[in-house]
């Protein structure tokens, strides 16, 4: 399964230290292998799943949208939206999704 990294995800990983980058990479591989593993969100974040993992005594979250179940095999792409600690995570994610929708990009 292919991974598509959105700007907030890419920027966070770019600024992270190498051990955290490796931990994030491991979690991305887990999610790509089993996209249904994360917790499904409802309401404003409907369709988004969040995978939690611990690193260095902190809990990190990865927000992603798995492909549709009826998607053709060549379109099995997981969109990774954001990664970070819990503080303001959901507020920032909602803001990004709202701005993405207003600019006309496909979520």
Regions found by a protein language model. Name each.
Residues 15-18, 33, 69:
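Secondary-structure boundary motif
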Residues 55-61, 65-107:
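Enriched for short, Lys/Arg-rich terminal
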């Amino acid at each position: 399964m292919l991974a598509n990294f959105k700007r907030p995800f890419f920027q966070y990983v770019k600024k992270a230290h190498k051990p955290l980058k490796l931990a994030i990479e491991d979690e991305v591989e887990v999610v790509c292998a089993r996209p249904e593993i994360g917790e499904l969100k409802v309401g404003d974040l409907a369709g988004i799943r969040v995978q939690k993992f611990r690193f260095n005594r902190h809990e990190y979250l990865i927000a992603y949208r798995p492909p549709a179940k009826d998607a053709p095999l060549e379109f099995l792409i997981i969109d990774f939206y954001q990664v970070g600690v819990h503080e303001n995570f959901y507020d920032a994610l909602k803001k990004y999704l709202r701005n993405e929708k207003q600019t006309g990009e496909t979520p």
